[in-house]
A protein has these predicted regions:
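Catalytic-loop motifs flanking and including active-site residues across diverse enzymes
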Residues: 148, 215, 259
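Arg/Gly-rich low-complexity intrinsically disordered repeat tracts
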Residues: 26-28, 35-63
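Catalytic cores of processing enzymes, dominated by hydrolases/peptidases
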Residues: 198-252
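N-terminal lobe of the biotin/lipoate ligase/transferase fold
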Residues: 1-28, 32-33, 60-197, 202-203, ...
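C-terminal accessory segment of soluble enzyme catalytic cores
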Residues: 2-3, 15, 228-300
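Short glycine/serine/proline-enriched coil/turn segments at secondary-structure junctions
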Residues: 41, 55, 143, 212-214
Length: 300
């Protein structure tokens, strides 16, 4: 990890995982296009239970956490909302974990480790295409966000959960792995780059920033996203890496709401959370009136 002495931010960099790059690139996982409920028995013994990942969870009730569905929202607007929530959490104005679920209009973002040298087309071309480039403080390289990609930004107090950054990243991978398994897609980790992969094709990405124990930014799962803009960059800063989507692996479009529902269920299971829906307007009210707790709406 890198540390910014000015802002006390810790940024995630790739680490060693349990799958070697050679094994990942040479494997050809089978794809089950049948019943979405079908699970791959190869993963039946996989540990995605937070009670076994962290034994302290076995005797604790699930942590209360707000789930906010933002729909399709401009990247900079969502980024500002995240930093506002993180600031409120650091100051003690908000004491509850919050996860933002959303999609972005087309945008390229540059992480701490990825610059414009990984852009394979001219910036003039991107301007003509109407796609902005935004530099952010998350870990990782250049990436693309767009409609059809499910993004989750968990703004979580890692210290309160007694979970380290490496385990938290592994948990986000578990969430995506279990989600795509629901539709019979076998994905796996890659020791060269965090996220989830189908062979040499990346299906889900992770980029985090941590400020005083509070996480922000998060995961991006390619569901029905247009993959063409990914060909205009070197994803993850790696040559010969391609992106894939659940739609491409299955040969059919998926309802985003269904995928989002499963992702929420996996957040609850993996991180031992009790997600309760609240609205964007209620969240804004709490940021403006810190003594007012946003009302819980119907379940997620």
């Amino acid at each position: 990890m890198e540390t910014s002495s000015n802002h006390k931010l810790r940024y995630l960099l790739p680490g060693v995982t349990d799958v070697s790059l050679t094994d990942t690139l040479n494997s050809k996982p089978s794809i089950n296009n049948g019943n979405p409920a079908t699970r791959n028995p190869q993963h039946a013994t996989r540990n995605t239970n937070s009670a076994t990942r962290n034994p302290q969870h076995a005797t604790r009730n699930p942590e209360f956490c707000y789930a906010v569905d933002l729909g399709r929202i401009d990247y900079k607007a969502a980024w500002k909302l995240q930093t506002d929530i993180v600031s409120a959490r650091v100051k003690g104005i908000i004491d509850t974990d919050i996860i933002l679920f959303l999609e972005h209009p087309a945008v390229f973002t540059l992480g701490r480790r990825g610059g414009r040298d990984h852009l394979l087309v001219s910036e003039e071309f991107l301007k003509t295409s109407g796609i902005p480039i935004v530099q952010v403080e998350r870990g990782g390289h250049i990436t693309f966000h767009g409609p059809g990609q499910l993004v989750a930004y968990p703004i979580v107090n890692l210290k309160a959960h007694r979970i380290g950054v490496v385990d938290f990243v592994a948990a986000l991978e578990d969430i995506m792995l279990a989600t795509v398994q629901t539709w019979g897609i076998t994905a796996e980790r890659n020791s060269a780059n965090r996220g989830i992969w189908v062979g040499n094709n990346k299906l889900g990405s992770i980029g985090l920033a941590i400020r005083k124990g509070i996480s922000f930014h998060g995961l991006a799962l390619n569901v029905n996203i247009d993959l063409k803009p990914f060909s205009w960059i070197q994803p993850c800063g790696l040559e010969g890496v391609w992106m894939t989507s659940m739609q491409q692996e299955l040969g059919r479009e998926l309802p985003m709401n269904d995928v989002c529902t499963v992702v929420k269920e996996q957040f609850e299971s993996v991180l031992d959370l009790n997600l309760t829906a609240t609205s964007f307007s209620h969240l804004q009210q709490q940021l403006q009136n810190p003594n007012q707790r946003p009302p819980a709406e119907h379940g997620v």
